[in-house]
Amino acid sequence: VDEMQDYTPVQYAVLNRMFPCPKTILGDFGQFLNPNHRYTLDDLRKAYPKSEFAELNKSYRSTYEIITFAKRVQNVVSLEPVKRHGEEVALISCKNKEEQYQNVKQAIDRFLSGGNAALGIITKTNHMAKELYGILKTEQSVNLITPESSRFRNGVSVTSIQMAKGLEFDEVVVWDADNRTYCTDFDRCLLYIACTRAMHKLTLIHTGEQTGLIRD
């Protein structure tokens, strides 16, 4: 069972009835996608009182700089980045939306002239991804990843946090990282998911006030 944090205790009870076999259950309680499913690892262990527990703390996907930054968003104390260094995370504040669009287009141009395979431009919702894709596709070669998408393509992809979960990109641009879009504890989980999709390079871009979910 993958993404254990997204299942409720009731759903686990159903799984146990349907599949009374040994199970391996994996997940990350820092990555909730459903705000109504907020329970703890202790709650899960009560459902499996005789289970063996192993905590995997080493993060191999992202650079040291990206994981260190992500821990400023979600305080996952036990998470240990590998000693693979890269660029510092970029936080870009724009005067208006037009400047924000231009910055994203420049990020796409830099990606296309580099040697990386996949750039993810990640929005908070599917609706926001569709809107941004509609603007970018007039000037750039970009893909849109939606619930209806059947496969993942390299290149530039615009998608939501929901659809990006489980994916990884060489580079990530988090769109609208402002204090209106990301402001609640649940938003903290979403922003953490978005940031940890990046393997080598992470940029957060916004207009207005930067989200307050990034700790000093």
What are these model-predicted stretches?
Residues 5-216:
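Conserved helicase motor core of SF1/SF2 NTP-dependent helicases
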Residues 2:
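Walker B catalytic carboxylates
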